Swiss-Prot record:
The lineage of its organism: Bacteria, Bacillati, Bacillota, Clostridia, Thermoanaerobacterales. It comes from Thermoanaerobacter sp. (strain X514). It is an enzyme of class 1 (oxidoreductase). The gene is proA. This is Gamma-glutamyl phosphate reductase. It catalyses: L-glutamate 5-semialdehyde + phosphate + NADP(+) = L-glutamyl 5-phosphate + NADPH + H(+). It is found in: Cytoplasm. One of its GO terms (cellular component) is cytoplasm. Keywords: Amino-acid biosynthesis, Cytoplasm, NADP, Oxidoreductase, Proline biosynthesis. Its main location: cytoplasm. Its EC number is 1.2.1.41. Belongs to the gamma-glutamyl phosphate reductase family. Gene3D superfamilies: Aldehyde Dehydrogenase, Chain A, domain 1, Aldehyde Dehydrogenase, Chain A, domain 2.
Length: 414
């Protein structure tokens, strides 16, 4: 089976990856970036095949946007690899060191996780991001992208692997599962002992399937039912601009806003301004009963809308009595990704920051900033919505673990 053969190769490569020096890794990353630019034509040609097939199957426009590559996006992938090369290498760093009364020196050293499996859907840029981050953090990576992007992923991964191996990276460190049969994914999720960690990136159904069926440890990522609460002291122009950015800039990504909650005391003034702006930009508004009374042109929301990650130009809107009801709503429906409050009230801002149990919580800013690059981590492997090991944008450090190193001078336990 393809995945088992490649997992064994990755396991062998991981031992050598763990001891690679930083200069070799940085040289490889920059060579990989050069190769993406040099072979951009091959990448775009392969991507065109994927896009044509997606259009034939009437895939949603927002999902085709995630799939589509152009010169600018390939250049951004290359830039991301260069940025990763410029980041400090976490591997081998000692976080703490202390001395025991018997003279033993004990420290916590950052080390690679080993072999990381990435299961993702239709965003071919993930192929480059994942390969780069895993390489810099000393891990071998097995990539399994969605069938929608198979031609793009084969082109990108083969270009990256060739460039990496030319600069001293062990063969088997960057591999793509080319078989699009779902059984390969099921086998991949059972390869304990060969794969150390699986990170799924994609929609709710993909992540749910991996969590429920993988015997390999999983970090849950990505599903983003994100909220913005417009408090009664919010400045309307700021609130409107933030909501438009969070919904319209890239509606098909996990940090786009899906539900806006509006304080009842400003609803009659603010909602018409917001609805007019959003509808002019092609957004479909689904509102609660009060929203519909104020703006009759909107569609009526159902309970299903409050729990839906649309990944499209659709926005649910609800009028709430105040911050307590907003917090209750977010607690009930949030996926723990990103939430924002628009307010000039310091106490409410602090209450929101402390009360909302999500990976990223904002005051007066768009949820679209939940991103490794925007946080200064360089590219990210995903946004973790769980609490164990990693939370929020997962950069280099989150792709490592630690071990204790103990330095002695002949001590024995008595």
């Amino acid at each position: 089976m393809e995945v088992e053969v490649k997992a064994k190769q990755a396991k062998a490569a991981a031992r050598r990856m763990a001891v690679l020096d930083e200069n070799t890794k940085n040289l490889a990353l920059n060579h990989m970036a050069d190769a993406l630019i040099k072979d951009m034509g091959k990448i775009l040609e392969a991507n065109k095949k994927d896009v044509v097939e997606a259009e034939k199957r009437n895939i949603k426009a927002s999902l085709i946007d995630r799939l589509k590559l152009d010169e600018k996006r390939v250049e951004a992938m290359a830039k991301g690899l260069r940025e990763i090369s410029a980041l400090p290498d976490p591997v081998g760093s000692i976080e703490k060191m202390w001395k025991r009364p018997n003279g033993l020196q004990i420290g916590k050293m950052r080390v690679p996780i080993g072999v990381i499996g990435i299961i993702y859907e239709s965003r071919p840029n993930v192929t480059a991001d994942a390969a780069g981050l895993c390489l810099k953090s000393g891990n071998a990576v097995i990539l399994r992208g969605g069938s929608d992007a198979i031609n793009s992923n084969i082109a990108i991964s083969s270009i990256l692997a060739k460039a990496a191996y030319e600069t001293g990276i062990p063969e088997g460190a960057i591999q793509l599962i080319e078989n699009t049969d779902r059984e390969e994914v099921n086998r991949m999720m059972k390869l304990n002992g060969l794969i150390d960690l699986i990170i799924p990136r994609g929609g709710a159904s993909l992540i749910k399937n991996v969590i429920e069926n993988s015997t390999v440890p999983v970090i849950e990522t990505g599903v983003g039912n994100c909220h913005i609460f417009v408090d009664e002291t919010a400045k309307f122009n700021i609130a409107k601009d933030i909501i438009v950015n969070a919904k319209v800039q890239r509606p098909g990504v996990c940090n786009a806003v899906e539900t806006v909650l509006v304080h009842k005391s400003i609803a009659k003034e603010f909602l018409p301004l917001m609805v007019e702006e959003l509808t002019s930009l092609g957004v479909e508004i689904r509102g609660c009963q009060i929203t519909k009374e104020i703006c009759p042109q909107v569609k009526e929301a159902t309970d299903k809308d409050w729990e839906t990650e649309y990944l499209d130009l659709i926005l649910a809107v609800k009028v709430v009595d105040g911050i307590e009801e907003a917090l209750d709503h977010i607690s009930k429906y949030s996926t723990g990704h990103s939430e924002s409050i628009i307010t000039e009230n310091y106490e409410n801002a602090m209450m929101f920051l402390k009360s909302v149990d999500s990976a990223a919580v904002y005051v007066n800013a768009s949820t679209r900033f939940t991103d490794g690059g925007e946080f200064g981590f360089g590219a990210e492997i995903g946004i973790s919505t769980q609490k164990m090991h990693a939370r929020g944008p997962m950069g280099l450090e989150e792709l490592t673990t630690y071990k204790y190193v103990i330095l002695g001078s002949g001590q024995i336990r008595k």
